[in-house]
Every structure is written in structure tokens, then in C-alpha cells.
């Protein structure tokens, strides 16, 4: 499992505040940050393929398949088990100091790998910031999303 940050390089806390405040204006349309750039599926698949080729150069030829929302995989659960982060109360994977502003990609392989100890963690505690800031109030409860409320 890998992640790729999608915040603009020039993003600051002021930029994030402006974006969030823009969501509070119902008469103003807003396009999600992740949809403003190149198609992340293509970008990540290309990067994962390069990574697979690099691995083959280092350790020998093995089979690989790059997946970015293109296979019936539970990506958040796999990422959590791999130690990338934890599932937040907003149902997304969260990373310490990065939040949820990243894409997930999977590199499947037939290469034998050592298993490691599960590093599942949850650092949300009593925090409900992501639920409180949801502009459409789409969360019925922690970890429970009413997807019908996601679109204005």
C-alpha cells in the first residue's frame, strides 16, 4: 500500500481555511481539490508501475499489478493493516500530520514477503473535528456516513 498527497504544494493553513469557508456558502459551487488536477488513477498507476520495475531490478522478476480504485480491494483496511494510518470517524484513512488529503494505491505481487506485526492504531480519541466540520452534516454518528447528504 502506498499513499500520494494531493494538497497543492503552495497550500497553507490560510488556503485550507478559505476552502472550508467556501463550502459554507451554499450558493457557490465548489470542486473538490482532488478533482482539479490530472486523473489520479493514471498518475498513481504509472508511479506504481515504475516502482514495480524498480523492485524487479533490485530483487528479480516477479509479477505485479498496480491497483488504484480498480480492483475489489478494501484499500482503507489494507492501508490500516500496513501501518499507513487509521480509519477516522469520517470513514477515511487518516495519517498523522496529513489528515486525509491523499490517494491510496495498491501494488499486488507474487513476490514472497515477510509478514509484519499488525500496527493498527486509532488516534481520534474523543476528537470529532471532522464530523463537526462536515458542511452537509452527512455523519449520523462516528464512522456512519449518510452518502445521500454528501451532495448539496
Question: What do these predicted ranges mean?
Answer:
Residues 1-123:
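Auxiliary alpha/beta "docking" domains used to position bulky ligands
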Amino acid at each position: 500500500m502506498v499513499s500520494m498527497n494531493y494538497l497543492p504544494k503552495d497550500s497553507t493553513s490560510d488556503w485550507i481555511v478559505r476552502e472550508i469557508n467556501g463550502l459554507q456558502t451554499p450558493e457557490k459551487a465548489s470542486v473538490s481539490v482532488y478533482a482539479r488536477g490530472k486523473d489520479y488513477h493514471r498518475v498513481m498507476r504509472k508511479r506504481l508501475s515504475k516502482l514495480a520495475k524498480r523492485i524487479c531490478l533490485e530483487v528479480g522478476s516477479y509479477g505485479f499489478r498496480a491497483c488504484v480504485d480498480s480492483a475489489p480491494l478494501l484499500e482503507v483496511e489494507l492501508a490500516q493493516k500496513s501501518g499507513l494510518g487509521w480509519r477516522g470517524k469520517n470513514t477515511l484513512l487518516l495519517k498523522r500530520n496529513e489528515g486525509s488529503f491523499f490517494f491510496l494505491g495498491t501494488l499486488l505481487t507474487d513476490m514472497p514477503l515477510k509478514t509484519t506485526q499488525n500496527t493498527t492504531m486509532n488516534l481520534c480519541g474523543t476528537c470529532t473535528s471532522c464530523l463537526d466540520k462536515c458542511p452537509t452534516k452527512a455523519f449520523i454518528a462516528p464512522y456512519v456516513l449518510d452518502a445521500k447528504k454528501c451532495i448539496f
